Structure formats: structure tokens, C-alpha cells
């Protein structure tokens, strides 16, 4: 919950990135650059080659400073706001983080010695963050004119041991050794922070004192030379500045505002294999990397909001505890190298710095202290200092620290030099003052002379002004008079321009009227010529149309006569074919009747044979029954056991014979039914043929009637058309002679309408005749096709009936043979049974077996005889049926061939008639098309209508000016124009406007006349 609260209300750690330029060694070795900085977009791009692939990683920070960035740029953009917040009462921390040799110490300290070339001891351009922050603090405090006090501490963390870099140097060797053996302890302050017991706090009053302390402490800091850095820091340093500022509340109470600035220069992480560290240097590098690794773990824990943050794993992280996740505003300056051999350390630094951006601190303003509390603390400090002074002054003379003595001597020398410089400046100022006094006296004399000349010039000016006023008055009068003349001339010019415009309009109207008259005469001539040409075209068309109509009438008459002849031929052919068909039907009836009688006789013979066979079988059965009865007494006991078997065999034989008789009767009945069906179909075919020829005769008669009617209607329409055309032409000719110009268009329209209507009626009549003939021909074709289809169907049915009869006879013959075989089989089974009985009763029934065997043989002989008779009857019946069927089929085929021949003749006749009609239709269409083309050529091409040429003038009403308009064109009198000008432009108003002589818009007298 607390981490989420800090995240909501906290402030992110500010992370800056600075890239150093290439060193001399790197430039000599042409080391590739793998890091590029974009200051504007605050991005850093690192190029990598992983598995042969070029990969760029981009990191974003709060601010980015490239190799060309100066110390002042970094300080002004990043550190100035932090120092201002320290002066507002916040605790702030700035520390540099990065690999060894990337410029951390240079960024934090730089060149902190005072520049001798600058006045008043200014800072050099290479000064780092610490000296610039010190200077800003004292400049701000001096500018505020507030009461303040500043304390500084400077400690070093070397191999996890804290050393005071500001400790006095005059300690005895024993004391120094004891102090080295017992490093300064690090203790908790009870408020979440830490403090170092025994750490010296130096009170300073100026920036120079801080610079001196900074130089003294930096000289004590442990450094060593490695392969990567000639002056590598082997320890972490922490420079703290504590500021107390006095403030007064509106109630008059005095409070002390406290702010603290921690400036940390971390030792750089290094790779021992590349830095060349050995023995003690290797141990130093291990401790440095260990503390920096702990710092990275702390950053990761804070970013991931873990429950445990390992602050206590290193004294460095304990010192920076309040700066990382505490109540301090923190700024991290990450320094990197652009060279490729430092790529691994550069990526590590960028990763940790980028993660540190997500750390959120919760800065708070330090609580202001009461003045009494601070005075109480100061009293204790004063008592401690008094004890030290008393102990120091037990000797003779005045005791002063060496640093203070050297400082006062240097200040005295500086002040003496400044006094000498100021004395020389005073002498120079006196000389300049004397020169200025001499110049002032000369200036006064020149001023008096100029005053005299000014008086004379003013007198001349007053006289000149009077002359100028009179001249201006005369000039105004002259200009006013010229304005009057210009106004009169302009009005007269306007009248003149209007008259000229009116004259030009009249001239153009006159020329246009002349051209219109000539155009009208030309149009009348063109219309007369066109009327004469059209009259000739109409006369020629009348003669040609009469000739074409007479030719058309003759062709229609000849076509009608050909149609009558053709219809008579079709009628004769149909009658002859009808008579032949009736004869064939009579012959067919006779043959069918004879076949029926023959079938009846054969059926009676078969029935007689069946009856005889039945009687013989019954006699045999009776004899067998009697014989069996006579021997029943002797073999009762034995027959009792086989009675059922014997009776069943004879029952089966009896049933087989009965079924044989039934099959024969059914065969005869079905044969009669089939012949009866054949007769009915033959009668239906005969009736249909008669009906067909009757319909054909009716259609022929209808065609003759319709052709005659069409011929009469065509002749009448042609006669009516000729009469109407002659009357219309005569009346139109009379009217054209009377008024040709006005009635040409109406004559042409009536001629067109008359010809079009008559041609349309003629075409309708021709098309209706063609339609009727086509319908008639199609009806005849349909009847013929229907008759042919019926006859083919009848032939196929008759052929199928005959084939089915033959198949039926063959099937019945097979059935009869099967029944006979079954009878023989039953007899053989009975014979076998009797044989078994005879063998079993051989001794008792030898005589009876002999009798039964003779009876069976006689029955078999009778059966064989019966089969022979049935076969002979069947053979005779098959021969007769086959002969009659062949005769009927031949007769039907002959009738079909005759019918096909007659139908083909009729079809040929119809086709020739169709061709005749088509040729007649084509001739009529060609003739009508010729008449239509001639009419179109006459009335659309030769008969020319008048076409506008565009030269005929349109009707225009000329604009005739009235007398009042002509009178208004006169120019006004000059006196009237002068009065009008003076009314609109008075002399007084003109005089007020023309205060100066104006340049005229025209040269004098250039356009007056």
C-alpha cells in the first residue's frame, strides 16, 4: 500500500546521460563508434551485432548530452533547478554513475581552481558541477542579502571504510594510525537516514573557502593508474553542503530554513582483465564492483516495488538510502563511452540508468527550526571552539592556522594590486576631465556666433513668408479660373462624344438594313429555283409509280393462278391415295378373318386331343384302381402302411393332368383375345385414315377460298390506290400552280402520307396472305405428320402383337412340354414306388406287379401318342400362325410404304408450293421495297426542301431616337456651366483645399482647343 501511495505522490528520479568524446588512444586506434546521442529527442542509440544481425537499441532519458556538450551546458540545463530547490529547503543529491574512465570525476569536480585571467577569481570553462553549485549558492545568498551559514563535509568510501577528507593534517603519527585503524562509524539517525560519527564540518563564508577545502580533500583521495584511466578514482566520495537561512514570519518570529546538497562522485566499475588491476588494485576493483552491484540491486528492488530493499548490503547504499526512494530529490548523471571495446559496460550502465528512471522519491521540505534552538546548538559549538583556542594560545604570540595565514596573505597581495590599478585609473580620469573642459569652452563660443546668425535668418524668413502668402493667393485665383475652364471643356467633350456615338450607331443600322435587303432578294431566288426542281421530281415519280403498280398487279394475278393449279393437283393426289388405302384395308380385313377361322379350327383340334388324352388317362386309372382293389385282400396289412404314399402319388398325377388341361384352355382363350384386339386396332386405323383424308380435303378447299379472297382484295386495293393517287395528284397539282411557295411543304407531306398509308395497307395484305398460306401449309404438314405417326404406331403395334403372339405360342408350347414332363415324372415316381413294393412283396404280388406294369406301359404309350398328337397340332398351329402373321406384316409394310410414298409426294408438292410462295413473297417484297426506295429517293433526296443558309436577316426593330433625346445631346451654355461649377466648388472651399501649389495634371493649354 505504501509503495502504491509513493508511486501516486512521489517524484521520479531524474536521470541524465553524458557521453564523453573519444580519447587520444581511441582516435589513434580508429575505434568504431557504437553509440549515438540525439540531444533534441533525448535518445541514445546503441548498435550491436548479434549472430551476424545488426540490432539497434534505443534508450530515452530526461536529458542527453553528447560528446560536444560543455560543462556549462550540463550545469545550466540540469543542476541549476536542483540548487534552487536546495535553497528552498529541500535535500537534494547529485551523483555520477558509470564505467571507469568515462568522465565522472571530470563532470563532478572538473578544474575547480580559480582562473587567474578572469577578474575577481571567476570559474574556468572546465569547472564541474561542485564548484559551479558552490558559486551559485553564494551568489544567490548574497543577492538575497539574507543571514545564512554554510557548512561542508567531504568523506571517502574506500574498501567499505569511511575516511574524512577534511580532517586536520597536524595530527601526530600515532593519532593518524589510530584513526586509520578505527574508521568512522556509520550510524542510524532514527529518521530513516544515516550519520557519520566524528565527521568534521567546516563552516565557510565564501566560495573560495569551499574551493580550497575541495582541493585539499581531492588531493587526499585515493587514485591510481590503470590501462583504462591514468588517474582512476579508487574510492567513492561524498561532498555535502548544508545551508541555514534566516527568515522572519509575519508575526515577527525568526525561523531557520535548512537545505542540504549531496554531491557524490562514484568510483567507476571496471573489468579487471582489461584494466590490468593486480593485487591491491584488484581488491579495490572488487570492492568497487561489489558496492555498485549492490546499488544496482537496490535500484531493481525499488523499480519492481519489492518488499525488501537491500540497503544494508553496502555502506554506499546506506549513505544513499535517503536519495533512493526516500525524501530527497535525486539526479543521476550516467556517463558512458562511445567506443566499441566498452560496449558491454556501456549497455550495463544504460540498463541501470534507464531502470533508475522509474524510482519514485517522496521529497519533503525540511522542517524550519526556531532561532532559539539553533542558538542553543551554536552555543555548544562556541564552547567547544573556545576550549580549542584556549588550548592553542597557551604559547607566546598569536597562533593562526597555516591555511588562514596563506589565505590572508594572498588576499592582501590582491588588494595591493587592485589599489595600484585604481590609482592609475584615477590619473587617467583627471586627464580626460581637463580635455573635456577645453572642449566645453570652444562649444560655448560657437554657440554665441550661431545665435547671432539665427536672429538675422529669422528676420529674412518673416519677409519671405509675407511675399509667399501673396503669391499663394494669386496662384489660388489662377488655379480656380483654370478649374472653371477645365470643367467647361470636359462638359463640351462629353456632349461631343455622345453625338459621335449616336452617329456611329445610325451608320451601323443603315449598313445592316442594306445587307438585309440583299439577303432577302437572294432567299426569294433560291426558293423559286427549288420549287421548279421539286415540280419536275414529282412528275417523274408519278410516271414511275404507275409503271411499278401495273407490274405488281400482273405478278399477283400470275401467282394466284399458279396457286389454284397447285391446289387442284394436291386434291387429286389425296383422292387417289384415299382410294388405294381403302382397298388395302379391305384386303387386310379378309386376311385377318381367314386367320381367325384357321386359329379356331386348330384350337378345336387341340381340345379334341386333350379330351381323348383325358379319357385314356381315366380308363387307365380305373383299370389300375380295379386291379389294386382285387389284390387288396391279399396285401391289406402291407398296403395299410404304404397307402398314404401311393394315394398321394396318384393324386399328384391327377392334379398335373388337370392343370395341363386348364393351361390348354387358357392358351386358347388368350389367343382368341389377341386376334380380337388386332381386329379392333385395324378398324381404328382405317377410321383414322378416312378422317385424315377428309380433313385434308377441307383444308384444300379453305386454301382455295382464302387465296381467291386475297386476290380480290389485293386487286381492289390496288385499283383504289390508283384512283386515290390520281385524284390527289390532280388536286395537288392545281393547288401547287395556284400558290407554290406556301403549299410545297403540305403537298410533300400529303404525298408522303398517301404513299406510306397505301404501301402499309399493301404490305399488310401481302403479309396476311403469306401468314394464311403458311398456316395452311403448316396445317397440311401437321396432318400429314400426324397420319404418318399414327400409321407408324399402328405398324409397330401390329408387329409387336404378332411378335407377342408368336412368343406366347412358344411359351405355351414350352409350358405344355413341361407339364408333360411333370406327368412323366410323376408316373416314373409311381413306377419306382410300385417297383419297391413289388420287390418287398415279391413273393405275394408277382401277378399283380405284372398286370400293373403292363397297364403302366400302356399308359406311357398312350401318353407318348398323346404327346405326338399335341406336337403335330402345335406344329401345324405354329406354321399357320407364322404364315398368317407374315402375310399381315407384309400387308402392313406395303401399306406403310404406299403411305410413305404418298405422303412424300404430298410433301414435295407442298414444298414446291412453299418455294413458289416464298419466291412470290420475295418478289412482292422486292417490288414494295423498290417502290419504297423510289419514294424515299424522290421525297427525301431528289425532292429538296428549303434549307436555311443563316444569311437571312432576323427581324430587328431599329432604335429611332426621339426629338427630346436629340435635343438633350446639345451642350449647355457656357454661362450655365460656370454657374454650376461655382455652385459645386466655391472659392473659399477651393482655397482651404489648395494650401500648397499643386502640380497640374496636364500641361498648360495642351488640350484646350
Curated annotation (Swiss-Prot):
Residues 997-1009 have a biased composition (Polar residues). This is Kinesin-like protein KIN-5C. It is found in: Cytoplasm, Cytoskeleton; Cytoplasm, Cytoskeleton, Spindle. It comes from Arabidopsis thaliana (Mouse-ear cress). Residues 12-359 form the Kinesin motor domain. Pfam families: Kinesin. Residues 862-882, 987-1009 are annotated as: Disordered. InterPro entries: KIF11-like, KIF11-like_kin_motor_dom, Kinesin_motor_CS, Kinesin_motor_dom, Kinesin_motor_dom_sf, P-loop_NTPase. It comes from the Eukaryota. Responsible for microtubule translocation. May be important for the organization of phragmoplast-specific arrays of microtubules. Plays an essential role in stabilizing the mitotic spindle. Required during mitotic cytokinesis. GO terms for cellular component: cytoplasm; microtubule; spindle. One of its GO terms (biological process) is spindle organization. ATP binds at residues 98-105. Residues 406-526 form a coiled coil. Keywords: ATP-binding, Coiled coil, Cytoplasm, Cytoskeleton, Microtubule, Motor protein, Nucleotide-binding. Belongs to the TRAFAC class myosin-kinesin ATPase superfamily. Kinesin family. KIN-5/BimC subfamily. Its main location: cytoplasm. GO terms for molecular function: ATP binding; microtubule binding; microtubule motor activity. Disulfide bonds: none annotated. Residues 863-882, 987-996 have a biased composition (Basic and acidic residues). SUPFAM superfamilies: P-loop containing nucleoside triphosphate hydrolases.
